[in-house]
């Protein structure tokens, strides 16, 4: 599940965890609520604790402790798990929830939860997150597979996918597109708030990535932006290099040794300076699928 901030992700995570703790119909259920740090996990756990006290005001069935919740009727337990915990083994999860997976540097915690489910008859693993700005991390890889499943390029009948995101050709500044990323628009977050955030990003390019990833749930390629894409596009034009034949030209080359692109930049001097950049991918790399997929 991928959706922007202020859409009730934490409440949904807490509700799912408590459902699988109480109503999954499995004796000795073990629910793992996982995050990238103890502080992050505590936010979701505090919501679980609050909900549990609302469900069972007298504490007859549900008992909330500092880092776990016990459901006495079936001897089931909800536990908090963080990537920075010293011990990440010995679990027997019936349900696992990964919160804000976009920030996970590795898939270690997800792998631990999945591998602990082998003895369960009906285990479930839920990943819930906003977009991020590092497409090399496990979350974006999982997202890529999910989209391939949605597009029927891959098959996985056990995978439920909900991605609330802009389409590739959508203008992130256009108010008509915001409903795509905010299913709770004007319920848990107002159009006025999003409009203010977007205007802030337009006025200050350094805020653009934060607004696009968190408010508009759009994956970006870096944590900060010095110049916006629109500013760069306005400064570009199509130029025919052959028209500069005979003029001084400086060439810079960045060769690719493994799976990267080879880049060549040309600087032609003719009173003013003209920059040109070209990328190449060698035929041998195209013929090697594993390298091609790494680009």
Give the location of each predicted region.
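Residue-level detector of conserved catalytic or cofactor/ligand-binding positions
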Residues: 281-295
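Phosphate/NTP-binding elements of NTP-utilizing enzymes
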Residues: 1-253
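Ser/Thr- (and often Asn-) enriched beta-sheet segments in non-cytosolic proteins
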Residues: 68-70, 275, 295
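Gly/Thr-rich phosphate-binding beta-strand-loop-beta motif of the actin/hexokinase/Hsp70
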Residues: 245-268
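Carboxylate/His-rich catalytic cores and anion/metal-binding grooves
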Residues: 39-41, 261-283
């Amino acid at each position: 599940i991928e959706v922007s901030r202020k859409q009730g992700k934490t409440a949904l995570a807490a509700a799912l965890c408590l459902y699988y703790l109480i109503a999954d119909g499995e004796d000795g259920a073990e629910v793992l609520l996982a995050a990238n740090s103890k502080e992050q996990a505590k936010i979701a756990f505090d919501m679980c604790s609050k909900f549990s006290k609302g469900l069972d005001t007298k504490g007859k069935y549900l008992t909330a402790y500092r880092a776990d919740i016990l459901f006495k009727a079936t001897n089931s337990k909800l536990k908090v798990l963080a990537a920075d915990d010293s011990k990440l083994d010995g679990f027997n999860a019936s349900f696992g929830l990964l919160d804000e997976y976009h920030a996970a540097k590795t898939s270690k915690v997800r792998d631990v939860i999945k591998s602990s489910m082998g003895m369960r008859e009906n285990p479930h693993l839920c990943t819930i997150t906003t977009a991020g700005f590092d497409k090399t991390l496990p979350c974006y890889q999982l997202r890529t597979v999910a989209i391939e499943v949605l597009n029927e390029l891959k098959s996985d009948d056990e995978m439920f996918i909900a991605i609330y995101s802009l389409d590739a050709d959508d203008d992130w500044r256009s108010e008509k597109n915001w409903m795509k990323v905010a299913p709770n628009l004007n319920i848990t977050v107002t159009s006025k708030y999003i409009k203010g955030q977007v205007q802030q990003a337009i006025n200050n390019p350094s805020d653009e990535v934060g607004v696009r990833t968190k408010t508009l749930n759009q994956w970006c390629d870096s944590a900060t932006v010095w110049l916006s894409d629109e500013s760069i596009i306005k400064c570009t034009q199509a130029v025919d290099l052959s028209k500069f034949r005979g003029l001084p030209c400086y060439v810079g080359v960045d060769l690719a040794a493994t799976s990267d692109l080879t880049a060549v930049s040309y600087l032609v001097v003719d009173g003013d300076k003209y920059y040109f950049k070209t990328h190449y991918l060698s035929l041998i790399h195209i013929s090697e699928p594993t390298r091609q997929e790494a680009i």
